Every structure is written in C-alpha cells, then in structure tokens.
Amino acid sequence: MNYQSTKTFFLCPTRLLLTIILLIVISIPKQAAAAEHQVLPGIDVLAGQHFALLRGKRIGLITNQTGRTTAGVSTIDVLFHAPGVQLTALFSPEHGIRGEADDKLASSVDSSTGLPIYSLYGTSCRPLPDMLRGVDMLVYDIQNIGTRFYTYIGTLSLAMQAAERAGIPFVVLDRPNPIGGVDVQGAVSVPLLPKASAQRTEQQDSGCGALTSIHPLPTRHGMTVGELARLFNGEYGIGSNLTVIPMSGWQRDMYFDDTDLDWVNPSPNMKNLTEAVLYPGLGVLETTNLSVGRGTDHPFEMYGAPWLDAAAVARNLAARQVPGITFTACTFMPTTAGQPYRGTICNGVCVATMDREQLDPVQAGLHLIQAISEVHPERFKADAGFAVEVGDSDAWELLTQEGESPAEVAERWDSALEKFMSVRKKYLLY
C-alpha cells in the first residue's frame, strides 16, 4: 500500500467509519484503562500518545498473535488504521504471524490488510534489504516468555542489526516478562554468532540456528523484551537508533497472572503460564530422546518415552525433594508431527509446580535429567543442542557420568552470573 492509497483509504466513507470505531476502542482514556488493567503494554501506551513517534512514517511491523492491546485488538489492525501512520510491511517470527505453525514458513500476504508478510523463520532470519525498501521504521511487538533459547529474542537482535544497517530507527513496544523480572538463573551462554559489527555480511545472519543463543545471556534472564533490546544495543555492538515504549504499571516481581492481561499462546505448545515457568529448565529436554508432551494438552508438563521406567524415575525424584515442584508417574500420547513417539503411548513423569517462588526451574531440569540418567544410563541421550540450550558444554557429562549434583553444576555458573547482573542493571526500565 503506497502513500496515495493511504490517503484514499481515509476518504472512503465505509472505511472511515471503521477507522473511527477502531480508534474509539483503542483510545480508551488512560484512567479507565488503568482501572480495568493494572498493566498497559507498550502498544496501549503508544496509542495513548496518539502514535506521535510513528506519524508520517512508513512502518514495518514485526509481530504475531501476541501483539495486541488490552482490548484485544491486534497491533496490526491498530497501526493499519492509525491516523498519520502508514503500515507497509509485516514480519513474522517462528510459528508465523498467527502463531500456529511448527515448521519454517515462506513469505506470504496478509489476507486482512493485503500487506506482505516476510517470514523471519524461513530462508532468512532477519529482514533483508529488499524487504526494507519503502520502510522508514521497524516496530517490534511480540510477547516473549523469559527464556534465552526461545527464538523471539534472537529475531529481535537480528532485526535490530538489519535496521541499523539500513539506517532506519527501531522501536520496541514493551511487554511483561511473564515469569517475572527478579530471578536470574542458569548458565550464561556462549553466543553462536560473533559480535555484531558493520563488517559482518548479510549471509552470516541468514541461518536460524543462532536464534537460541545469539548473545551471552543466562537461561532465565529476568528482563523484558525492551530491556533486552537496550542490553543488546549497548553491550553487543548493534548501535541501532533504538526507542523503547515502556509499559505502564508493570513491576519486576509480577508474574503474568498478576497483570490482568489475557494469556495468548506465544507459540502452539506454550499454552499457559505454568509451562512458561517450567520452560527455562525443562525445555532443554527437547534436545534429548524424550517426548516433552508436544501435541498433548499439557506440553512441557510431562516428559517420557515408551521405554521409560516412570515409577523408578518418579521415586528417584521424590527422594531428591526438589523445592517448589513435584514429579509423578503418568502416561501420555504425543500427537505432533515430527516429534518423538508420535501416536505412541509414553511412560513418563508429570510435573506440577507447587510454589513458583521456591522453584528454580533450571536446577529442577538438572534433577530430572540426572534422575532419568540414573535409571536409564545407556538409553537416555541428548544431541548437540543440549549444550547450546543449557549454555554449558560440560553439564551433560558432569550430571550423567561424573555424578556431580545439580547444585554443584549450577555453582560453576555463579561467577558469570554475577558479571551479567552487574551489566544487566544498567538497562533495566522498571
């Protein structure tokens, strides 16, 4: 849609009426919105500012189904109808613009707006120069889940780098860290891509493998996406013309269910807050030869295989008395295509979070790994992705062969965590 068609759009009486109705919905007075919602995400704050930062600009929007106002209006629709704003292109992360895909996606066209959708999880994982022609500003609005190896923050970094190279500003509409902004846990990762620089080639960013460990971060980083953007920009050589639109009302000790915002699945198998809380530690089991419950009603809350002695593993874990969590023997059948043991009954352990304030999900994951290894020392295996997601190339051997306790493995990370915390505090907004 070019500038001339935008002017025509606002002259069409039917569309003008639609625009007025939509703007009434998204332009709720701040006091009324605050009374109904304790936390206002960045898109609501931007609307309250009458889109001043975006006016007169051709906007490229990086988003998915989680980009929405407190009233449930998608950020796509908000910006498409915002006065003085010309939305010209959409960019989708892993799982697509609607968050329903489990495979890599090709670029396409949005049926609602007619805008091009450029996939950032296909042949390229960052906006390429051709995609940015006719874009004056990139805007990012995606709900993340607080775990380093969830790919959306890798997409954030690569998009910021692309914006810097194209000489266009980058705007982040901030959203809550659903598992809080206080606890920081896990190993600080070794990045899979070298530090950003103007000398790096476009081809270096084309692969998606680095998205799970693009910068040195602990597994559970305790930062919002806006804070991460500030950290990436200031510490890792991006140097983008960055603006973060902060939330209103969010506090660091809030979990998502403290915000009064509606949960929207950020990916097909991230169906509730409990799974997000467990994911920093137990999500790494996707790199093993277990099913993690994908294709069930409770992914990341059950782990198993047809060969697993569930009762023995559950007894081993009960004896460990892992704080804040329980493990019970169960059976389940994964159904997602391409996942281990699809259509086969698996024996496993089901996980219940009893006290998330006491739970260290990273150490809980280490306990689960060690317990299964003790019961099945020959059968239980992990691929090369385990070291990447945990952030420690020695952790598997230490847990499964050397017999070091989860606490001893975690102690190896303390020095790097302390250094990260001293850097992190410079970029916190709340």
Q: Which role fits each region the language model picked out?
A:
Residues 144-156:
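Glycine/threonine-rich flexible loop motifs
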Residues 15-27:
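Bacterial N-terminal signal peptides
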Residues 304-412:
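Conserved functional hotspot residues or short segments at active or partner-binding sites
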Residues 202-279:
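Conserved anion/nucleotide-ligand pocket segment
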